[in-house]
């Protein structure tokens, strides 16, 4: 079938202009100075992330809550021996070590992602970091 050139036709109606919702109309009509709630500041994507990175790099406090970590330690220890008791300093030492390990693995994971020309870490980056470290064959 041969193609034919289409000519412009006059419109016979079409869609009517949509009415604004009451909330949108009210929001536009009320100036911000007349008692309207001021919206919180919206930062550009990545700004808050960089601020958090700087904040956590400066700090030395533990990032995992103490009680949930303690429950996890007790749950894992119960698989090996029941009725084990832990000194509070022992649980803190375990938590320090666990957090240091996690920070290190995430640093290596980030390097693996950057090497792959990405900024987002993925499970395959963690697997590669562990493989290079010799933790998993």
Curated annotation (Swiss-Prot):
List of residues that carry N6-methylated lysine: 5, 10, 19, 24, 28, 38
Compartment(s) where it occurs, according to its Swiss-Prot or TrEMBL record: Nucleus; Chromosome
Subunit structure: The nucleosome is a histone octamer containing two molecules each of H2A, H2B, H3 and H4 assembled in one H3-H4 heterotetramer and two H2A-H2B heterodimers. The octamer wraps approximately 147 bp of DNA.
Main location: nucleus
Residue numbers spanned by region Disordered: 1-43
PTM annotation, UniProt: Acetylation is generally linked to gene activation. Can be acetylated to form H3K9ac, H3K14ac, H3K18ac and H3K23ac. H3K9ac could compete with H3K9me and prevent gene silencing. H3K9ac is restricted to euchromatin. Methylated to form mainly H3K4me, H3K9me, H3K18me, H3K23me, H3K27me and H3K36me. H3K4me1/2/3, H3K9me3, H3K27me3 and H3K36me1/2/3 are typical marks for euchromatin, whereas heterochromatic chromocenters are enriched in H3K9me1/2 and H3K27me1/2. H2BK143ub1 is probably prerequisite for H3K4me.
Name of this protein: Histone H3.3b
Family of this protein: Belongs to the histone H3 family.
The keyword S-adenosyl-L-methionine appears for this protein: no
Tissue occurrence: Pollen specific.
Gene name as annotated: soH3-1
Record GO terms (molecular function): DNA binding; protein heterodimerization activity; structural constituent of chromatin
Modified residues (Phosphothreonine): 12
Described purpose of this protein according to its UniProt entry: Variant histone H3 which replaces conventional H3 in a wide range of nucleosomes in active genes. Constitutes the predominant form of histone H3 in non-dividing cells and is incorporated into chromatin independently of DNA synthesis. Deposited at sites of nucleosomal displacement throughout transcribed genes, suggesting that it represents an epigenetic imprint of transcriptionally active chromatin. Nucleosomes wrap and compact DNA into chromatin, limiting DNA accessibility to the cellular machineries which require DNA as a template.
Keywords of the record: Acetylation, Chromosome, DNA-binding, Methylation, Nucleosome core, Nucleus, Phosphoprotein
Membrane-crossing residue ranges in chain numbering: none
Entry-annotated residues carrying Phosphoserine: 11, 29
SMART domains to which the protein is assigned, alphabetical: H3 (SM00428)
N6-acetyllysine carried by residues: 10, 15, 19, 24
GO CC terms of this entry: nucleosome; nucleus
């Amino acid at each position: 079938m041969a193609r034919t050139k289409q000519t412009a036709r006059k419109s016979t109606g079409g869609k009517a202009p949509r009415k604004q919702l009451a909330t949108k109309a009210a929001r536009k009509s009320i100036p911000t100075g007349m008692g309207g709630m001021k919206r919180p500041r919206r930062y550009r994507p990545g700004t808050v992330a960089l601020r958090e990175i700087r904040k956590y790099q400066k700090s030395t406090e533990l990032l995992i809550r103490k009680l949930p970590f303690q429950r996890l330690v007790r749950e894992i220890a119960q698989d090996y021996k029941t009725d084990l008791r832990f000194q509070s300093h022992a649980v803190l030492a375990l938590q320090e070590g666990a957090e240091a390990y996690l920070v290190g693995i995430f640093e290596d994971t980030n390097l693996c992602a950057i090497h792959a020309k990405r900024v987002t870490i993925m499970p395959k980056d963690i697997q590669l970091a562990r493989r290079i470290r010799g933790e998993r064959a």
